Structure formats: C-alpha cells, structure tokens
Amino acid sequence: MKYADIDRIYRNVPLDRIPWNNETPPDQLVELVETGKIQPCRAIDLGCGAGNYAIYLAVHGFDVTGVDSSPAAITIAAENARKHNVICRFITADLLGDLHEIPGRFGFAFDWELLHHIFPEDREKYVQNVSKILTSGAWYLSMCFAETDPQFGGTGKFRTTPIGTTLYFSSESELRELFSPLFIIHDLQTIEVGGRFGSHRAVYVLSRRR
C-alpha cells in the first residue's frame, strides 16, 4: 500500500470521483447490523476513508473509531460526522505499524475494500494487528476484490486502476489460509458488490477472533 498515493487522492480528487467512496453502507454490513447478528459495541472501521460506514454504525448505537492512513481522509471523515451530528473518533495510523495510536480493544472490526490495497508480503502483519485490537470472540468482517473480478483488465493478481492505485486480487483459498490461524471463519464466499463505477466480484469473509 502506498500511503502517499491514497492521501494524494483524498487531497486532490473530488469525493464523488473516488471509486471506493460510497455514502451508502454495503448491504452485507446493513444485514449484520439490522438483523442483530452484530450487536452495538466498540467498533473499528479500518481504512475508514470519508467515514461513511463509521457514521452508519454510530447512528445504530455503536461506539465507533475510524482509522485511515490518510490525514486528508481523516479530516474529511471528522467533518462528515459533524454534518451528520454523530460522535465518532477518527485517527490517522499506519495499519501495518504498532497501532499505538489506537486505544483499547473492540468487539467488531471491519475493512471494506481495504485488503486489496495491502500486498501479500504485508497481509500477515495486518491480520495480526487486527487480532491484537479485538477482544476474544469479536467479529471481523473483511471484503476485498476477487481474482475472478472482470474489472481493471480482468486478469492478473496485480492490477492498476484508472485512479492510479495498484491492487492485489485474492482467491478464496488465499484468504482462508490468511485468516484461519487467528480467526474462526463463519462465512467465506465470492459475492457481487456494487461500486460507484460498476459492480465487482469480491471475496467476503466473516469471522470471529480466536
């Protein structure tokens, strides 16, 4: 992940042109929350961007912290929360670092369209960090683009997007191997997800910390 590239995008590209900036929370998150499968608790949005999903959780009773590597994104997220009259904490942090900026532990973590920005050599460290900030039995929801996704050329594990980012496209087996040592997987499947500029094929993983 190139943090400077992400920050540059938030500083220079209008929010409605950033592909992953969707104001409406994903159906999969909404279902977990509104059916009560995930109960209000301390929650953390990893790679929160403009804070849209963190705000959704706060409206539904969660005590939410949003984290992003981009200071510009965090500034936007804080202003977004003020506009919606909700309380969220937003923190700039390196999710591959020691996470000293993030206080306490959480009962729910999620990253939506973050993991494909993290390349294989850094993923084990990232998942260890997620485990470190969760309580035992906490839920963890992750979604990243699948290697079968037809977008951005439709082939290859590494693909460059029109906005200039390079993403890594995963298989179900890769993610099962990545998460299983630290998490009990409850659901892992390839799904279709909507996007600002078209739908994507993605791998959805719902798990609990061991």
Residues of each region from the PLM?
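Class I (Rossmann-like) S-adenosyl-L-methionine-dependent methyltransferase catalytic domain
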Residues: 1-44, 50-102, 118-129, 139-210
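A conserved beta-strand element that flanks and buttresses the S-adenosyl-L-methionine
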Residues: 110
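Short, conserved loop/helix-junction motifs that constitute active-site signature segments
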Residues: 132
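Short catalytic micro-motifs in class I SAM-dependent methyltransferases
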Residues: 113-117
